[in-house]
From Swiss-Prot:
PANTHER family in the record: LARGE RIBOSOMAL SUBUNIT PROTEIN BL34M (PTHR14503:SF4), MITOCHONDRIAL RIBOSOMAL PROTEIN 34 FAMILY MEMBER (PTHR14503)
Designated gene of the protein: rpmH
GO cellular component, one term: ribonucleoprotein complex
Organism taxonomic ancestry: Bacteria, Pseudomonadati, Pseudomonadota, Gammaproteobacteria, Thiotrichales
Gene Ontology terms: biological process: translation
Keyword Ribosomal protein attached: yes
Key words, A-Z: Ribonucleoprotein, Ribosomal protein
Gene Ontology MF: a single term: structural constituent of ribosome
PROSITE patterns (alphabetical): RIBOSOMAL_L34 (PS00784)
Name of the protein described by the UniProt record: Large ribosomal subunit protein bL34
Species for this entry: Hydrogenovibrio crunogenus (strain DSM 25203 / XCL-2) (Thiomicrospira crunogena)
Length: 44
C-alpha cells in the first residue's frame, strides 16, 4: 500500500497558502479567525 502523504511544496501552497485563502470568502473568514486567535502563522 502506498503512503498517502506525498509532500509537494507547490501543491501545499496552492491549496492552503495565503493567496488561496484570500481567493474565497470562507478563506478570508479562516484568516480573520486565525488573526483573532493571534496565530503566529496565518497560512502555510
Amino acid at each position: 500500500m502506498k503512503r498517502t502523504f506525498q509532500p509537494s511544496v507547490i501543491k501545499r501552497a496552492r491549496t492552503h497558502g495565503f493567496r488561496a485563502r484570500m481567493a474565497t470568502k470562507n478563506g478570508r473568514k479562516v484568516l480573520a479567525a486565525r488573526r483573532a486567535k493571534g496565530r503566529k502563522r496565518l497560512a502555510v
